[in-house]
From Swiss-Prot:
Pfam families: Ribosomal_S20p. This is Small ribosomal subunit protein bS20. GO terms for biological process: translation. GO terms for cellular component: cytosol; small ribosomal subunit. Residues 1-18 have a biased composition (Basic and acidic residues). PANTHER family: 30S RIBOSOMAL PROTEIN S20, SMALL RIBOSOMAL SUBUNIT PROTEIN BS20C. InterPro entries: Ribosomal_bS20 (IPR002583), Ribosomal_bS20_sf (IPR036510). It comes from Chlorobium phaeovibrioides (strain DSM 265 / 1930) (Prosthecochloris vibrioformis (strain DSM 265)). Gene3D superfamilies: Ribosomal protein S20. Keywords: Ribonucleoprotein, Ribosomal protein, RNA-binding, rRNA-binding. GO terms for molecular function: small ribosomal subunit rRNA binding; structural constituent of ribosome. Residues 1-25 are annotated as: Disordered. Signal peptide: none annotated. Belongs to the bacterial ribosomal protein bS20 family.
Length: 91
C-alpha cells in the first residue's frame, strides 16, 4: 500500500484509468466479434457492412486517442476489410 498521500492519489488515478482502458478495449472486441458472428451466420451483406463500419469507427477513435497503437488499429481495419471483401465474393 502507498505510504504517501500523493502515492495514494496516483493509485486511485491509475485504477480509474485502467478500468476506462479495459472498458474501451472490451467495446472494441465486442464490435469485432459481432461482425465475425454475422459473417459466420451468413447474414445479409448490408448488416455485415454496418457492423464493419461501427468497428472501424471505434478502431479509428481508439487509435487516435492512443488507447491502442495506431498501427494495431490500421492492421485490424485491414483484416476486417479483407473479411468483408471475401464475404462479398462468397455470395
Amino acid at each position: 500500500m502507498p505510504l504517501h498521500k500523493s502515492a495514494e492519489k496516483r493509485l486511485r488515478q491509475s485504477d480509474r484509468k485502467n478500468a476506462r482502458n479495459r472498458a474501451r478495449k472490451k467495446e472494441l472486441k465486442v464490435l469485432v466479434k459481432n461482425m465475425q458472428k454475422l459473417v459466420d451466420a451468413g447474414a445479409p451483406k448490408p448488416e455485415v457492412e454496418v457492423a464493419y463500419r461501427s468497428a472501424v469507427q471505434k478502431l479509428d477513435r481508439l487509435g487516435v486517442k492512443n488507447y491502442i497503437h495506431a498501427n494495431k488499429a490500421s492492421r485490424k481495419k485491414s483484416q476486417l476489410a479483407r473479411i468483408l471483401n471475401e464475404y462479398g465474393k462468397a455470395e
